[in-house]
Structure formats: structure tokens, C-alpha cells
Amino acid sequence: MVLILLCIKADLENVSSVSLPPGCQYCLTVKHSSAEDTREGVYVSSTETHELTGSRGTANFTLKWTKDSKHESYLNVQEVKNVTRPFTSEDHGKFVPIIGFECRGLEPVDWRPEDGFIVKAPSGTVWEDVDLSEKEWVDYDEKSGESVSIMELEWEFRVHKEKK
């Protein structure tokens, strides 16, 4: 199985960290691993589990690419210890892995950010359920008296290679 990391990069103003809560949904476009078929608008969450056909295992998302297919593609959402973490103000200009997807028979090729982000300011102010579907967010921190923003949100997927 392949572990693919979703990595983000953004310009932060008066923001100390950006994260997603455990169990949130990710809206993905997935591609068949050995063909050109894709599915857009696929929602996956670590809180959903489905039994795998002909196996004792479970997955957070399953898909048969054709009705008569005997093979099931699947994906598990997972945090990777010492790898996935919140994006912080110190990460300017770098892509940071925020979540991992363990995949078999499919791979994520795009992500559509939505709401649910948790944004923290240096003053201690916390905004929950922030919507980044427009790839930017602006607000005002009353504690510090400063504007706060997330701009130019970008993302990419990377295959995770465990260090030995």
C-alpha cells in the first residue's frame, strides 16, 4: 500500500497555526492507480469505516471502478506520527504534510479545501470552522488589535517514503 501525504503551503499574517480537527472530511478527486478513470467530489473521513469485500479489514472509503469489478479500491485517512502536523508561521514558503492517505487501487490527485479549519493567533485567539474554499481568509483579532489572514493557500500530494 502507498501512503500519500496532503501537504499545504500558505502566507500567514498574525496567525500562529492552521490545522484541521481529527475526524474532519476531506473532499478529494481520486484517480484509478492503473487507468485514467477519476472520481471528483469524493468525501473521506477517518470517522467512517466500511468493511472490505472478502477481507477482515476495513477502510474509510471504498470504490469499485466498474459495477462488475471483482477488485475494490480503498483509502484510509491517517495521521502519521512525527510527520503530519499543523501548518505554522515558521513554515513560510514550505509545504507541510497535514494528513496521510493510505491507498490501494486509487490515489488522490486533487483536494478541495472547505470549512472546518482551526486557526490560532499569537494572542491566543482561536477561530474554529474557518472556510478556506476560496484559498484565503481574513479576519480581525480583537485581543491584539490586528488583522489576521491566510493567503495564497496551495497544496500538493507527496508519496511518503519512511526513513529507515
Residue ranges of model-derived segments:
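Glycine-rich, aromatic-bearing surface loops/beta-hairpins
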Residues: I99-K164
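C2/C2-like lipid-binding beta-sandwich modules
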Residues: M1-V15
